[in-house]
Amino acid sequence: LAVGAQMVASGRIDFMVMFAYLLMVSRIYAPFDQALALVSELFAAESSAKRMRSIMEEPLAEGGSEFMPVGHDVVFDHVAFGYGAGPDGRAGEQVLRDVSFTAREGQVTALVGPSGSGKSTCARLAARFWDATAGRVTVGGVDVSTVDPEVLLRDYAVVFQDVLLFDDTVMGNIRLGRRDATDEEVLAAARAANCDEFVARMPAGYDTMIGENGSLSGGERQRISIARALLKDAPIVLLDEATASLDVENETQVQQALSRLLAGKTVIVIAHRMRTVENADKVVVLRDGRVAEQGSPAELLEAGGEFARMVALQRESAAWRL
């Protein structure tokens, strides 16, 4: 370009000749740019295809169709677990090591511990999202690894922080908890979960389309998830407490809905707030994939161990002001 400009300035070539040359060069290089972009997209597609193939090749969890537990106590018996597997088929890095505790029917068992301690993994193993690599998880005396996951999950209601909404109405999203539920049953569950308050502001009420993952606030999404669980009315509830990120009004609404959901159930809650922990019947403190201590909140506070230290730190941070 600089040489061409110099030649035009010196009169050696005409400006239109220079312009035609530049136009021709741009036309020649355009297909190369497109080819490079296409190659980049092909590499990205290949990477995605590999991930999809790995998912499709993952063996399906199998088990019997009979599930007749005696009660709904959830027992972890010397459980170990590691994500992934190496070429030799052995599990990857251990996330849980020799974890043993019992979540009693009719009680709230709170799992507490620092990030990465294994709380979420325990909740997922309880519902057989994965199988333990050592030890066993039982429900009412039945080893969950022997039960078909679809059959097992009929006895579970799951309320995790990442609430999935679908391209459907509010009522349709709540009905996912139990597909054969009547409209009256869906509305009753929604009212019990305090959904009426925000649904009333929608143009078509419970018939409003909310779209895939929707535009609802965190508290509103959480209440829809609780309504699903109330509608299902399963004897075991797995709850990943999400109130830490909610405003005061939404937190109050969610807590009221949870109190209705948890009554009389076997509850395993991944706890983040001390108010939840203090109201639990049992606390299991996890650290580095092991049970550091367990007992009632009062017992653990009196013992002055890991749990007492965590409570003191949270109370100290709550009292801190700018």
Regions of interest found by a model, annotated:
Residues 1, 37, 41-44, 80-91:
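An intracellular "coupling" helix at the cytosolic face of ABC transporter transmembrane type-1 domains
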Residues 1-19:
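A hydrophobic transmembrane-helix motif
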